[in-house]
Regions:
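Flavin-dependent oxidoreductase catalytic core characteristic
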Residues: 1-194
Length: 194
């Protein structure tokens, strides 16, 4: 942005804003993964999980306190969709084209072609279908509710959850593909098992 003639402070803010959606999704996913892992840790320890001499008790307290005072996961879910829609309305992100393509595809005969032999073809297809599902559900919600959709937080939260899970699935796939390209398939079996 500085190359475009913007002052440094505006460039830094603009750069950070560019990743705000991804940051919001990662924050929700990460903190909820922590909550799940800590809850399971308490379960594994049984009644001892609440006893101070076990480390899991502190992890559980910290995680639980975060859930009580934080409340930002709900805000970040709404922020994810709000910023995405603002980018679409501002012409920075084309949502209408892909949404119309999904709607058109729903009216056509599905492709029952054979699987590609390309690495990760199945995973790529699944992620593509997850994205289509988001566009389909969001499109149906917007068509039915129009401007009232802003007040339908339950629908927005579910759409955000779909987007968060899809973003994380695609991120894992892309990371695994990159690691395999860098190191070779032979040494990357644990990543392939993911």
């Amino acid at each position: 942005l500085q190359l475009a003639g913007k002052p440094e402070n505006e460039s830094l803010l603009g750069g950070a804003e560019e990743y705000a959606i991804e940051c919001a999704m990662l924050k929700v996913y990460g903190s909820e993964a922590l909550d799940y892992v800590v809850d399971e840790g308490v379960q594994v320890h049984g009644g001892n999980g609440f006893s101070a001499e076990y480390n899991i008790s502190r992890a559980y307290r910290d995680s639980r306190i975060n859930r009580i005072y934080e409340g930002t996961n709900e805000i970040n879910r709404l922020l994810t969709l709000d910023m995405t829609l603002k980018r679409a309305m501002g012409g920075r992100l084309d949502l209408m084209g892909p949404a119309m393509a999904v709607q058109k595809e729903l009216m056509s005969i599905p492709d029952f072609g054979t699987e590609d032999d390309v690495p990760f073809a199945k995973e790529k297809r699944q992620i593509k279908n997850l994205k289509k599902a988001i566009l389909m559900v969001a499109g149906a919600a917007v068509q039915k509710l129009m401007m009232k959709i802003e007040g339908e937080q339950e629908i927005l939260m579910n759409l955000a959850d779909m987007a968060i899970e899809t973003f994380n699935a695609e991120s894992v796939l892309l990371r695994v593909m990159k690691i395999i390209d860098q190191r070779g398939e032979a040494v990357c079996q644990p990543y392939l098992d993911i």
